[in-house]
Regions:
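Long, charged, low-complexity intrinsically disordered regions
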Residues: 1-116
Length: 116
């Protein structure tokens, strides 16, 4: 994997319906590919009650579809975004600048890292 910056995409800032958030996700992944980016940090929130919001659930389900279809290489949910996670460690090894990411090791359930 080539070294690359991570682009942050806020999918939930204006509290869109789930369908709109998924359209944004699709557009942002397509745009990231055009820009030759390899990493996205998705901000989807985790629900107002802290138990998993509809946008988070839908986004993570869509990402799993993309993995199965070979459209993305992988993803790391925010709660796993730490040096003890195997994929996180691989991404950190190939892109040391990620070690400065403000969410690394914080178990932030409101984000997901996408490896394109």
């Amino acid at each position: 994997m080539k070294s690359d910056r991570i682009k942050t995409v806020d999918l939930k800032s204006d509290m869109p319906p789930v369908a709109e958030a998924l359209l944004r996700l699709d557009r942002e992944i397509a745009l990231a590919r055009q820009q030759k980016l390899t990493l996205l940090k998705l901000v989807h929130g985790y629900g107002s009650k802290g138990v998993g919001g509809d946008i988070k659930i839908a986004v993570q389900a869509r990402l799993q579809e993309f993995i199965r279809e070979g459209q993305i290489r992988g993803c790391v949910y925010g709660e796993n975004w730490s040096t003890s996670d195997e994929l996180t460690w691989k991404l950190l090894q190939s892109n040391p600048a990620l070690k400065q990411d403000e969410h690394l090791g914080r178990q932030n359930r409101g984000i997901t890292i996408v490896w394109l």
